[in-house]
């Protein structure tokens, strides 16, 4: 296929246009008075969202070069969401400002690599300032504040999440589901989650969420790889007679065995899902044993004299339900005996006490949390399906933000931590930088003002005035929902430090890539063939 190439200024202009379009769509959602964005779906009602990453994911531009710029900015939002779970709109606004000002500097003849070096130095100082001013969160009230701010100032969501985290602990698993009623409720169930997803996406049962969900499944726990069908067939035939689904946890499932399981799942003959066993080496054996005890099954292992081909249904674990996505597997309400589970928990606690290695101790604590923490299921209720999906998005955002806050602490929200990091950059000594590096440094300093400007403008206030005043006194910022100046942390307008830090680092990373781009290559769009319609057959009058 033939390709088209753009170079230098021409390429950068097109990329900037794409970046600008996606930024314009995303930035309107920022802050307490951010606006909604409507997303058209292929079927049903449009989705209403204020979630930056959901908006970014929908953007596909017609021009291939503009689309490249948009996709790079989409990467900023997605990466920030993956690492910190929130801050996608902030990251997008920061990146657009850096790209816009950076490309102006390149057009004026400055060296892109030196600009990037200056930007990296500024980001390092700003990140350090954010870390130094972060404050650890301890109380349940502070957890609720973080959650409600991330959920667009919804106090009810903050309260629900704080109560769930208090119940299952910081490392416990919290699942967000749709309720069948208008009420939003929280249920606590015993369960375990480990970081392995489905081996093949063909096992997925819910295409919208890309998840496999099975009720009342059997659980096969095997400590080796399964590649041939003959070993597994006798057991599958017995399970098929029961009509219940099967979750297979093994070192790996590949080749003929995987193909057969996929075909059976797609046909509906036997609902199955295969996942790789968690952990490595001896730790994997211990984790498989944990799963077996929780589900009331047994690890099928030749070390114990058990072979897969002669395994019986009695050796399989069971659970009320399992949920598998591309990264995690959650086993809810396993059928294991509570005495066996308690004994296992006590055994792990003794191992933690005896452990001399910090790493081993940390891994043992993770296993303990999985066995004893259980799973909190938050069921989101709303009047309409559109409202329910929008609320569910906000709850998922808030949960991620809260976890990030527990991990790295909190900073003042509302863009204040970033603009006060900009104030720290103003005091920095630039004498050791080249002129072009100094410009790169100032580009970041200017970009750090952009989130507070955008929050103010979304609330109908002049952003430049708010930005200048916000630099005056540390901790005092503009509450856009009440339109007043307040002590941000005291009134609970807070952001997780991890979210703010990740947004800045990811924005600077992608901006640097765009600034140092000299050539863009894209496929030439195919022209649709416009075949003229066949002429009517003249002279055929009188025929019926």
From Swiss-Prot:
Check the record and name the InterPro entries matching this protein.
Chaperonin_Cpn60_CS (IPR018370), Cpn60/GroEL (IPR001844), Cpn60/GroEL/TCP-1 (IPR002423), GroEL-like_apical_dom_sf (IPR027409), GROEL-like_equatorial_sf (IPR027413), TCP-1-like_intermed_sf (IPR027410)
Q: Does the keyword rRNA-binding apply?
A: no
Q: What superkingdom heads the lineage?
A: Bacteria
Protein name in the entry? Chaperonin GroEL
What are this entry's molecular-function GO terms? ATP binding; ATP-dependent protein folding chaperone; isomerase activity; unfolded protein binding
Q: Does the keyword Nucleotide-binding apply?
A: yes
One GO BP annotation of this record: protein refolding
Taxonomic lineage is:
Bacteria, Pseudomonadati, Spirochaetota, Spirochaetia, Spirochaetales
**Annotated gene:** groEL
């Amino acid at each position: 296929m033939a390709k088209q190439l753009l170079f230098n200024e021409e390429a950068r202009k097109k990329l900037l246009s794409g970046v600008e379009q996606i930024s314009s769509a995303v930035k309107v959602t920022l802050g307490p008075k951010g606006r909604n964005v409507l997303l058209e779906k292929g079927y049903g009602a449009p989705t209403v969202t204020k979630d930056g990453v959901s908006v970014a994911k929908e953007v596909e531009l017609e021009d291939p070069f503009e689309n490249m710029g948009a996709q790079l900015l989409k990467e900023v939002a997605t990466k920030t969401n993956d690492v910190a779970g929130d801050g996608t709109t902030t990251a997008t606004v920061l990146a657009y400002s850096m790209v816009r000002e950076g490309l102006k500097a390149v057009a004026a003849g400055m060296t892109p690599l030196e600009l990037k070096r200056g930007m990296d130095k500024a980001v390092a100082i700003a990140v350090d300032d954010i870390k130094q001013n972060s404050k650890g969160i301890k109380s349940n009230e502070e957890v609720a504040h973080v959650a409600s701010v991330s959920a667009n100032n919804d106090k009810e969501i903050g309260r629900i999440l704080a109560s769930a985290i208090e119940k299952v602990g910081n490392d416990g698993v919290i699942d967000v589901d749709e309720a069948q009623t208008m009420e939003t409720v929280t249920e606590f169930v015993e369960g375990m989650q480990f970081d392995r997803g489905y081996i093949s996406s063909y096992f997925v049962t819910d295409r919208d969420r890309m998840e496999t969900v099975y009720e009342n499944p059997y659980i096969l726990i095997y400590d080796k790889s399964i590649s041939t069908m003959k070993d597994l067939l006798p057991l599958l035939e017995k399970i098929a007679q029961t009509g219940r689904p099967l979750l297979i946890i093994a070192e790996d499932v590949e080749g003929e065995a995987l193909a057969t399981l996929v075909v059976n799942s797609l046909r509906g003959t036997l609902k199955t899902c295969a996942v790789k066993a968690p952990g490595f080496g001896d730790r994997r054996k211990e984790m498989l044993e944990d799963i077996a005890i929780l589900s009331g099954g047994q690890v099928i292992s030749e070390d114990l004299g058990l072979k897969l081909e002669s395994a019986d249904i009695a050796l399989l674990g069971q659970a009320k339900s399992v949920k598998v996505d591309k990264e995690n597997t959650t086993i809810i309400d396993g059928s294991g005996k509570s005495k066996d589970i308690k004994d296992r928990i006590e055994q792990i606690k003794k191992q933690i006490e005896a452990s001399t290695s910090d790493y081993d101790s940390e891994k043992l604590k993770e296993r303990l949390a999985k066995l004893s923490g259980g799973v909190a299921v938050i069921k989101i209720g709303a009047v309409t399906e559109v409202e329910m999906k929008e609320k569910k998005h906000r709850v998922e955002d808030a949960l991620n933000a809260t976890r990030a806050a527990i991990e790295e602490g909190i900073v003042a929200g509302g863009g204040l931590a970033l603009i006060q990091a900009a104030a720290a950059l103003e005091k920095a000594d630039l004498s050791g930088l080249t002129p072009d590096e100094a410009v790169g440094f100032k580009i970041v300093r200017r970009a750090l003002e952009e989130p507070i400007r955008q929050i103010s403008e979304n609330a109908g206030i002049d952003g430049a005035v708010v930005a200048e005043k916000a630099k005056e006194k540390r901790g005092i910022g503009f509450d856009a929902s009440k339109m007043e100046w307040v002590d941000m942390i005291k009134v609970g307008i807070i952001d997780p430090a991890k979210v703010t830090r990740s947004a800045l680092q990811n924005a600077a990373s992608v901006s640097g890539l765009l600034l140092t781009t000299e050539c863009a290559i894209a496929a030439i769009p195919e022209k649709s063939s416009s075949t003229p319609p066949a002429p009517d057959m003249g002279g055929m009058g009188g025929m019926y």
